[in-house]
Amino acid sequence: MKYYQTGFNSTFKKTIHNDQTNGKQIPYVRSVVKYTPTWSRSFMPVTQEEREHVAKMKLITNASLLKDKKVVFCDDSIVRGTQLRDNVKMLYECGAKEVHIRISCPPLLYGCPFLNFSNSKTDMELITRRCIKELEGDAYKNLEYYSDHTTKQYANLVEMLRKHIGVDSLKFNTIDIIRDAIGLPKETICTHCFDGTSYGHK
């Protein structure tokens, strides 16, 4: 099986240059290029119409490099699901055989009350809450189970997100993985958007 690595931002290209990801001599190709004159983050525009428009503009694909390939793409988070859903559709339209998504943080269950980085007005703008409402009939029910990656509720949520986005597989990092990577105890890290707790809570 032949593998390729790809990326579209300066950080990834710098990583390639520093040989941090090329230790296995996997060739680097530009199958996706980022069109930067749009919004820096596609979830920032106020209206859904603007968000969908920006999401469609941000990435330019090279179909010849994607056709008949099994691809794995990483993203930092899923907020409303707008950009990722459109990007996945675009990858399949380019002929990708399979699309697998890996998210570097846990599912976002709460809007940020401190920085509001997701620019959401209510928690119901989050795709996770809309899925929970569909699963439970109530977007605020059993949230402690949906934030715990060891529960069946969490597994059901991830599966519903996978179907909504339309990918072959979807996985998230966990709070434990993030904590271990940072090297700090959980009570010193704000994980509010993941599990509803803030600084000082285990």
Which positions does each model-derived feature cover?
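PRPP-associated nucleotide enzymes
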Residues: 1-202
